[in-house]
């Protein structure tokens, strides 16, 4: 009731002309979990909006050490391999925007990778409402049981929050599939996840990217085996220049010696040639030594092999911002990706897309003339008519969270007809706008959705007495045309 007016004068009263409205929540705000170059405070979610901001807070990644052995491909030292920084670069290259980072430790060789670190980070994320996607690229660096535990915990976390989904990476996703269940990477992946499947999606295989460039690679990645590389380079020189006095051979051997020479402690004396810098040594060896070029190329190629989850989070962001969350994130390319690590044919994708157990894995494939495309849009719950498609799961989350946030304004309001009408109209207006944007299917709004609330329809008198206001929302969501069948038939000549 308005305050009593006793003093003569003019009084102004403002009356709201419009009811509350539903505001659409963000749909593509990933949360990344992993090891960072710097860890200001572990397990504290931090919001960033660009790669520059990420670097300023968390730093870059230390160099991965590689082992050179004659006659063998160079191999990374597992303790020095971390994926989050490169994955963040792939995320932003594919259209990524604001996101959350949960550092679980520093990316140094002394760090012991542990599944518990990831689980603790998921617990910390429960306090943050904004993220809608959970990604953990470094989880594939754990052993298989550790990876399985983290993947299952990610799905359980999403089920608990009901406001986000997980993008999972296939463990050892660079491996070609086999016909043996005990060794097939997809079968092992499916066996490792069991519950809350509609909140997860996975992609296979991993991808060869162009994230790490030639200018970022040099011989410092081989610190522990540089002497072995020098031996190989010396043998290469001896084979190319049998005459030990050949000036070209001597010059190249001097370069080889410079690889392992300790850095100078003082400037050269007058008349002495300047000591070449590491950059000069690297560039010179790239120009003259096929073996050195091959080793550097192998290092770059291995650093550029990444699990696709972070890139897919960027694709989700790009699709959501340009087309809408209701558009399936498929039949689109991945930026900074050269090729999938494993080539998949249409027949090979049959089991990936529609297995008997429903645990669909979306394929990343190369098509002639079209490049690398994401060729699948299913969740891990492929046997569910409700939750088979990624865009359906994510659209429902958006609708649920948007309406939930708007309905908070009516908690403790009178549980009466006037409130029911207001809530129904508020939700109906929101869904009408979604229908106009293409998120719902129907020739008119009444065919696309319905909103029911009130005594005798969604509530009983007992519900009202106990403080319940039940609202039922039904929506007809857009589903992707996954299989387009075109039938051709010949007809008789008519003239």
For the regions a protein language model found, what residue spans apply to each?
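Short, small/polar-rich motifs associated with maturation and membrane association
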Residues: 109-112
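DUTPase catalytic domain/fold
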Residues: 150-151
